[in-house]
Regions:
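N-terminal core-binding DNA-recognition domain of tyrosine site-specific recombinases/integrases
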Residues: 1-40, 56, 174-179, 194-197
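Hydrophobic recognition helices of helix-based DNA-binding modules
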Residues: 4, 28-36, 155-158, 209, ...
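Short, basic (Lys/Arg/His-rich) helix/loop patches that form interaction surfaces
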Residues: 7-14, 72-81, 91, 145, ...
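Basic, Lys/Arg- and aromatic-enriched nucleic-acid-binding interface segment
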Residues: 14-18, 22-24, 37, 41-43, ...
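Proline-centered turn/helix-capping motifs that create local helix->coil transitions or kinks
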Residues: 35-45, 108, 117-124, 156-164, ...
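Catalytic-site neighborhood detector that most strongly recognizes the C-terminal catalytic loop/helix
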Residues: 53, 57, 61, 119-121, ...
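C-terminal secondary-structure termini that scaffold catalytic or DNA-interacting sites
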Residues: 110, 121-142, 146-151, 157, ...
Length: 259
């Protein structure tokens, strides 16, 4: 394991990331479990392998003024596909989930959308480059998200004009993930907003939700996290800002009465 961490990358000779090492460990453990079940080996002890700790990625999100700038441009623009950017800001959808979303996944009567699949780029069974739509890898990623009434209204107007089965589309066809990412990058450049990845929209939703007082468990379910602890670790900075605000409110309310 130490060798993998220090020099396991066959291309560069450098170490592998903790996530990559943990993936290898999982394959080893599953293989040995099967061997033990089949009687090929007498003892299974792979659970004792110490996994390297993964570092939580730094969360980057848009400021409130940047968010408002993006929203105004997306809603005022002629490109209807840009509405997807606003949808992500108010639902926390991943880009693959957004681009796999079909109109049948939006229940206008109940005001909810169902996340049941995701789009990504890869190779098909013939080894050719393709847009692949698959079910989520985890049960928690399959979820229903209540929509703010403002977003529901925008989606209703879009549906009247849409000729596609997909919510976000180019005419009748679906949009490739990379193509949509590039459109987003161009929009940021046009608005003179510092570059951030598309995933920053998801982080922005989570940050604003916490600022509004949403509890971590509810946010975790909306984001499709398997464990609220993941949400807690990832957005601990946002929670600290919220705690500071609450503590200042307590001070402002009661300290002056004690003087």
């Amino acid at each position: 394991i130490t060798e993998l961490i220090e020099s396991g990358n066959m291309k560069t000779g450098k170490g592998l990331a903790a996530n990559s090492v943990n993936g290898i460990i999982t394959v080893i453990q599953n293989s040995l479990k099967l061997a033990y079940a089949l009687g090929t080996i007498k003892e299974y002890a792979a659970d004792k392998i110490r996994r390297p700790k993964t570092k939580e990625k730094e969360v980057t999100c848009f400021t409130l003024s940047e968010q408002k700038k993006i929203e105004r441009a997306a809603l005022a623009g002629k490109k209807t596909k840009w509405l997807g950017i606003v949808v992500c800001l108010y639902t926390g959808l991943r880009i693959g989930e957004l681009l796999a979303l079909e109109w049948k996944d939006v229940d206008f009567q109940k005001g909810v959308l169902t996340v049941s699949k995701s789009r990504h780029e890869g190779k098909d069974e013939n080894g050719r480059y393709a847009q692949i739509v698959e079910s989520p890898k985890t049960v928690s990623s399959r979820r229903c998200i209540p929509l703010p009434k403002q977003i529901l209204c925008e989606l209703r107007m879009l549906k009247r004009k849409s000729r596609s089965v997909y919510v976000i589309s180019n005419g009748e066809s679906s949009i490739p993930v990379r193509s949509y990412q590039r459109s987003f990058e161009r929009l940021l450049k046009k608005l003179d907003i510092p570059h951030k990845g598309f995933h920053a929209l998801r982080h922005t939703f989570a940050t604003r939700a916490l600022e509004c007082g949403m509890d971590v468990k509810m946010l975790s379910e909306l984001l499709g996290h398997k464990d609220p602890a993941v949400t807690l670790r990832r957005y601990v900075h946002s929670l600290m800002e919220q705690k500071k605000e609450m503590m200042n409110k307590v001070g402002n309310t009661y300290f002056k009465e004690a003087k």
